[in-house]
UniProtKB/Swiss-Prot annotation:
The lineage of its organism: Bacteria, Pseudomonadati, Pseudomonadota, Alphaproteobacteria, Rickettsiales. It is a peripheral membrane protein. It comes from Wolbachia sp. subsp. Brugia malayi (strain TRS). Keywords: ATP synthesis, ATP-binding, Cell membrane, CF(1), Hydrogen ion transport, Ion transport, Membrane, Nucleotide-binding, Translocase, Transport. It comes from the Bacteria. This is ATP synthase subunit beta. ATP binds at residues 152-159. InterPro entries: AAA+_ATPase, ATP-synt_VA_C, ATP_synth_F1_bsu, ATPase_a/bsu_AS, ATPase_alpha/beta_chains, ATPase_F1/V1/A1_a/bsu_N, ATPase_F1/V1/A1_a/bsu_N_sf, ATPase_F1/V1/A1_a/bsu_nucl-bd. Transmembrane segments: none annotated. Belongs to the ATPase alpha/beta chains family. HAMAP family: ATP_synth_beta_bact. It catalyses: ATP + H2O + 4 H(+)(in) = ADP + phosphate + 5 H(+)(out). Its EC number is 7.1.2.2. Produces ATP from ADP in the presence of a proton gradient across the membrane. The catalytic sites are hosted primarily by the beta subunits.
Amino acid sequence: MNVGRTVKVTQAVVDLKFEGELPRIFNALKSKLEYRGKELILEVSQHIGDNIVRCIAMDSTNGVSRNDEFVDTGAPISVPVGRSTLGRIFNVVGEVIDECGPLKGKYDLESIHRVPPSFTEQKIQEEVLVTGIKVIDLLAPYLKGGKIGLFGGAGVGKTVLIMELINNIAKAHKGFSVFAGVGERTREGNDLYHEMITSNVINVNEHEKSQAVLVYGQMNEPPGARARVALTALTMAEYFRDHENQDVLFFVDNIFRFTQAGSEISALLGRMPSAVGYQPTLATDMGAMQERIASTTSGSITSVQAIYVPADDLTDPAPAATFSHLDSTTVLSRQIAEMGIYPAVDPLDSTSQSLSAEIVGEEHYKVTSEVKRILQTYKSLQDIIAILGMDELSDEDKITVDRARKIQKFFSQPFHVAEVFTGMPGKFVSLSDTVSSFKGIVEGEYDHLPEAAFYMVGNIDEAIKKAELIKDETKVGAKS
């Protein structure tokens, strides 16, 4: 048994001295004593000479003192994988934390540090993943097996959008989802769990019938947990892909906190900071995780990653490091959120590599191009409208502005997960309905309908019904 003794504790970093063989980098070390009723797990990060290893703690180091003993497990942190993990909540070291008893059934243990699939194993799929959210399916469609980034500042709706995506995709595609809560609010993690129970994504009585696994390392936890929890969740997703031949959905909320935790650890390990105080290994850390999110001949992992943008600055090194790995970007705009349009997706900033006639089809591509042209024209006319008003525009421009406003309003959509707050039932809109509805708007088929009819509805038929209701209400108001 290889035992090390504590020589120094600096917040989440612990130095241990080993008399015998040094444990390898990434090996897990277990405490002999219990702290706050449980063992403390450390991960070896550096060999710093004189038989001393520097480790990152996966939980609080409160109570750890000099000469406390830690045992080398001889392997990296290993977590449970397999169908028995479905419907359960785990922490970074693979312990269940949902108070539903120990893990039942068969499961394997896998290391959280794994090698990405080789080039020969990887496979590119060109199939669109329908989300049921109009603005995404039309303007920035997601590819099966792709990497999607949800960019947005604080409070513009990233978490709600992720919750809706989990809900819609679980119901429509019946695939397994793995959710990594990285450094976000504990309340949101709790809300998501109960929302999944309500929508039958998680079955608390028969866990094996569930379709999701939750792995949490929330913002009250030390940086070690926040830096590794995404890898724990990814390991579980990889098992479903490789051994169950599943098309898995991997959600991360929030990838910025993964970078932030790495930055905290880097400072505690004594590394020289890089641009804006981030760790010098930012690109390496990000690449090591992102390269594991891949589609193979066995199955696929489609990842949706919420990315907090500090001070709404997309050039910040943390979001910028993520950009190069993504296939689609969904940018959430504060200006659109202030207009009351939810989801607050910016239609001109959001992009997708799958938006080509070969993948989405000729009609979809043409409708999207026309929608973007109308919105871009409207954007360029806004200064003129602000200074001179609508009356100074040409008749053609007036029609363009009218259609652009209807398109903007029609991008809004009631969400299933927000029914409690909005009082409106959620809508899942099929891709064919989305394309045909927007085609009708850009071709002027619905020019006679009022702008308000397009707000917070599903397909175009609902907008027509809403227009009739508005007309009837106007008549009643006029009579009274």
